[in-house]
Amino acid sequence: MSQLTLTLLMIVSAYLAGSISSAVLVCRMRGLPDPRSEGSGNPGATNVLRIGGASSAAMVLFFDMLKGALPTYLAYLMGIDAISLGLIAIAACLGHIYPIFFGFKGGKGVATAFGAMAPIGDDLAICLMASWVVLLLISRYSSLAAIITALLAPLYTWWLDERFTIPVAMLSTLIIIRHKDNIQRLLKGEESKVSRKKRPKNP
């Protein structure tokens, strides 16, 4: 099989894997409202945190990251070049954003993108997660944390393993484009902050 054929197959596979909406499936399994029509309307971990609590959000985060990490890492093991790895990672993110199995209504692609970056190395994964968590705790804006972390990701990659700087920059660009509405709301002071679902108190 030629490198081009293998790359195209991995791009299609990555898109299909990305199209499996973890948020919708976890909410269905746990009897929670559909995240596409509840809260912010975004089927991602942050919105599931709002409507279902931390454990449900953690499940969504894990599986969304896995959707990006698995196809990208498999392609890397197959010897696919760095730029093609970036295209495969973008395909996984586009599957998450425009899922063929869920009416093409998906999330922002942040967890899937960061999951695709994580196999580059534990050090990069730690830098990404630490940046996102610290920025979220400081600002309470999930979107702002994602945007700034996306901007930092190519710099981290260049510092740690410059071979993958361009693919990571491609993913970061996609994340920022996907957050254009959030950027406008942040500038207007209209963006919603993250808050956990409040559990009813026992009588």
UniProtKB/Swiss-Prot annotation:
The annotated pathway is:
Lipid metabolism; phospholipid metabolism
* A Pfam family it matches: G3P_acyltransf
Give the enzyme's main class according to its UniProt record, as a single word. Answer: transferase
Q: Which reactions appear under catalytic activity for this entry?
A: an acyl phosphate + sn-glycerol 3-phosphate = a 1-acyl-sn-glycero-3-phosphate + phosphate
Its domain of life reads Bacteria
Query: What EC designation does it have?
Result: 2.3.1.275
Write out the GO biological process terms: phospholipid biosynthetic process
Transmembrane ranges, per UniProt, are 6-26, 82-102, 118-138, 141-161
Question: Where in the cell is the protein located?
Answer: Cell inner membrane
Q: Name one GO cellular component term.
A: plasma membrane
Write the protein's name.
Glycerol-3-phosphate acyltransferase
Q: Which organism is it from?
A: Shewanella sp. (strain W3-18-1)
Taxon lineage = Bacteria, Pseudomonadati, Pseudomonadota, Gammaproteobacteria, Alteromonadales
